Amino acid sequence: MLCGGTSQPVDADEQIQKICDSMKPHAEAQAGKTFDVFVAKTYTTQCVPGTNYFIKVHVGGDEHVHLRVYKKLPCNGETLELSKMLQDKRHHDPLEYF
């Protein structure tokens, strides 16, 4: 990984699913709809003053969304915020910086 670049995509784990679970209401508000399915599939990270998580999330059928979630540093409370969401993604779409 380059300094400031993103890591290689890896399979999502329980920690990443917990992040997605906490971001689901924010993603639904941004999308203007509810998601019956919201399962993290893969993710990458970017080290900034905190951490950016880029997460591919299955939302039903062949539909996915890509989330960018920012986690603040411990000295700033380690809170999470949904920075951006890309909709109309598919399983085969690469998870890239956005």
Swiss-Prot record:
Q: Which UniProt keywords apply?
A: Cytoplasm, Immunity, Innate immunity, Protease inhibitor, Thiol protease inhibitor
Q: What induces it?
A: By LPS. Slightly increased expression 24 hours post-injection in spleen and muscle.
Q: Cite the Cystatin domain residue spans from the record.
A: 4-83
Q: In which tissues is it expressed?
A: Ubiquitously expressed in normal and lipopolysaccharide (LPS)-stimulated tissues including brain, eye, gullet, heart, liver, muscle, stomach, kidney, spleen, pyloric ceca, intestine and gill.
Cite the pH-dependence comment. Answer: Optimum pH is 6-7.5 and pH 6.5-8 for papain and bovine cathepsin B, respectively.
Q: Which cysteines are joined by disulfide bonds?
A: none
Q: For this UniProt entry, what is the primary localization, expressed as one broad class? A: cytoplasm
Q: What taxonomic ancestry is recorded?
A: Eukaryota, Metazoa, Chordata, Craniata, Vertebrata
Q: Which PANTHER family match?
A: CYSTATIN 14A, TANDEM DUPLICATE 1-RELATED, CYSTATIN FAMILY MEMBER
Protein name, per record: Cystatin-B
